[in-house]
Design a protein with these regions (language model features):
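Amphipathic alpha-helical coiled-coil segments
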Residues: 63, 87-116
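Short, charge/polar-rich alpha-helical segments
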Residues: 35-69
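Betabetaalpha-Me/HNH-type nuclease active-site subdomain
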Residues: 129-266
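Extracellular/mature segments of secreted proteins
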Residues: 56-64, 112-124, 261-262
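Catalytic cores of phosphodiester-bond-cleaving enzymes
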Residues: 243-306
């Protein structure tokens, strides 16, 4: 709320920024700037990923409520108090706009990473995993630059002597997780005996656990994800969820997954050409979505991409 003068025998005059009466009225997340920053309800899986940003917005809005509850009528001898009151109002308005923008960027990233046609959720790391990731990230200098892409047919790798190797090992551990019969990109785990789209005249065999011999494949391997612009600038939580994003998982047969390794499907031989072309298109689509999510997460952190 904007401060006002109180004059004896005269009407009270509102300050120049009386519009803050509207801007500083916190209701729900979307109401602060409905024209440009309509932040919707925070639902799972975004709830965990964006929880700290939602809390930051709520904290600013609590300060706004406290500000608006403060007496705001000043007489002519209180010019300094009026100026301080209005300066605080302006600062809170700016803080709220920043908090809304950060939360919206996070929600947008979560929407990209957690596809509607997957039964796998985005989950934050454990505290122990978070600490390991932070320690690994700290080993990467600000002057480190990713290497050039490998030749077609060669694997994406993170050499043992490379600064991000510890980060790669931490992100690769237990990844992909055991997904059982999860639905990935709209496809249930293939049944035993189902046709293998990667190879003509082959079917999914039976694995030792009785399920089909199918693997949850990273469409874009973790080694390549680490080299995406801005990835190593993400927080440990954000790096963790990007490398485990439902968007980036698909079912492949054991044979196809073993043949693909950590390279592009373009380098595979002996596979169905139509399937290969579709996979190359899927890789291009997925890497664009991952980069978009990384950029949005960096924005939510307030981190300019190097």
């Amino acid at each position: 709320m904007r401060g006002t003068w109180g004059r004896r025998g005269a009407p009270r005059l509102a300050g120049a920024l009386v519009a803050l009466l509207v801007l500083l009225a916190p209701t729900d997340v979307a109401s602060a700037a409905p024209a440009t920053r309509a932040v919707g309800p925070v639902h799972a899986p975004a709830a965990d990923l964006c929880a700290s940003l939602e809390a930051a917005l709520q904290s600013v809005q609590a300060q706004i409520e406290q500000h608006n509850a403060t007496p705001n009528v000043f007489d002519e001898s209180q010019a300094a108090a009026l100026a301080a009151y209005d300066a605080e109002a302006a600062a809170l308005t700016a803080a709220q706009e920043t908090a809304i923008a950060n939360l919206q960027s996070c929600l947008d990233a979560a929407s990209l990473l957690a596809t509607d046609n997957s039964t796998v959720d985005l989950k934050p790391p454990t505290e122990k995993a978070r600490q390991v990731l932070q320690q690994a990230k700290d080993k990467i200098g600000n002057d480190w630059t990713p290497p050039a892409a490998p030749a077609v047919g060669k694997n994406w790798t993170v050499p043992k002597s490379s600064p991000p190797r510890a980060l790669y090992d931490a992100l690769r551990s237990g990844n992909p997780p055991e997904l059982g019969a999860a639905t990935l990109r709209g496809q249930a785990r293939p049944a035993v005996g189902a046709d293998d789209p990667a190879y003509a005249n082959r079917t999914f065999l039976t694995a030792a656990d009785g399920l089909s011999a199918a693997s949850a494949d990273h469409i874009i391997p973790i080694a390549r994800q680490i080299y995406l612009p801005g990835f190593v600038q993400l927080t440990p939580d954000n790096m963790y969820v990007v490398t485990r994003a439902p968007l980036n998982f698909q079912w492949l047969s054991f044979k196809a997954n073993l043949s693909k390794q950590s390279r592009s499907v373009a380098g595979m031989t002996g596979v169905d050409p139509r399937w290969q072309a579709e996979q190359i298109e899927l890789e291009d689509e997925t890497v664009r979505a991952l980069q978009d999510a990384i950029d949005r997460l960096l924005a939510s952190q307030g981190t300019p991409r190097r």
